From Swiss-Prot:
Biological or metabolic pathway of the protein: Alcohol metabolism; cyclopentanol degradation; 5-valerolactone from cyclopentanol: step 1/2
Active site: Y155 (proton acceptor)
Gene: cpnA
Organism: Comamonas sp. (strain NCIMB 9872)
GO biological process, one term: cyclopentanol catabolic process
Binding site for NAD(+): M18, D37, D63, V64, N90, Y155, K159, I188, T190, T193
InterPro entries, per database record: NAD(P)-bd_dom_sf, SDR_fam, SDR_superfamily_enzyme
Pfam hit, one: adh_short_C2
Family to which this protein belongs: Belongs to the short-chain dehydrogenases/reductases (SDR) family.
Domain of life: Bacteria
Protein's UniProt name: Cyclopentanol dehydrogenase
Function: Catalyzes the oxidation of cyclopentanol to cyclopentanone and cyclohexanol to cyclohexanone. The activity toward cyclohexanol is 60% that of cyclopentanol.
Length: 250
């Protein structure tokens, strides 16, 4: 307990799935969590549950593709908490289509949510972190930002972009003592992937290369996020933390 005591952390896409698990664990370990999402009902429910468990959490309605929303969110956090120690860029979507079946609109939508949001969020938090001369940004990518697989060209390209954007930011932001790292989960059992895992053929295709033979639980990925946000990772910068059950080793 207490691994991120008194840290102020903003998490995007925090109302459900992996994002909710990030928020729950960070709050349990002492952080004040600003849980952001487009879904206000689920967001408020999530905050209420975290508070019921003794954690400190606040909800922010945030469209991660909207620059003005980001400005407002950061201003709110600074007004209420006086600082922002960490940003977890978790929000993202998944579309399963091969490149030949992917429309321009689908490609643009994936990049808007999975890549533009990470850029906007990162840019929005730089100034308060620079003034404090410390900060931490964790970008949630994927193993499919490291390796290719059939049937998800736009998603994989977007997660690869997040990986390299993380490297670029690590170089740019090092003089301000802002650490930037990416997390690369393998197959995770979340509402977004459950339909795929419930189909035997697609489950075999996804889990076959995973050496541990199963999907990750969201908490197993959240532990990696917690580590990167914590001071335990004070010399971890520009890194890729892969949490994939051996998928990329196979």
């Amino acid at each position: 307990m207490g691994r991120v005591n008194d840290k102020v952390v903003l998490v995007t896409g925090g109302a459900m799935g992996m994002g909710l698990t990030h928020c729950t664990l960070l709050a349990r370990e002492g952080a004040t969590v600003y849980l952001s999402d487009m879904n206000e009902e689920l967001g408020h429910q999530a905050v209420a549950e975290i508070r019921r468990q003794g954690g400190k959490a606040h909800f922010l309605h945030l469209d991660v593709t909207n620059e003005n929303h980001w400005t407002g969110a950061v201003d709110t956090i600074l007004a209420e908490s006086d600082r922002l120690d960490a940003l977890v860029n978790n929000a993202g979507i998944l579309t399963l289509k091969p490149v030949q079946d992917t429309s321009n609109e689908e490609w643009d939508r994936i990049f808007e949510i999975n890549v533009r949001s990470v850029f906007l969020g990162t840019r929005a938090v730089i100034e308060p972190m620079r003034k404090a001369h410390k900060g931490c940004i964790v970008n949630v990518s994927s193993i499919y930002g490291l390796v290719g697989a059939p049937g998800a060209a736009a998603y994989e390209a977007s997660k690869g972009a997040v990986r390299l954007f993380t490297k670029a930011c690590a170089v740019d932001l090092a003089p301000f003592n802002i650490r930037v790292n990416s997390v690369h989960p393998g197959v995770i059992a979340t509402p977004m992937t459950q339909q795929i895992l419930d189909a035997p053929q697609s489950a075999r295709a996804l889990l076959g290369p995973t050496l541990l033979g199963r999907a990750a639980q969201p908490m197993e990925v959240s532990q990696a996020v917690l580590f990167l946000v914590s001071d335990e990772a004070s010399f971890v910068h520009g890194s890729e933390l892969v949490v994939d059950g051996g998928y990329t080793a196979n």
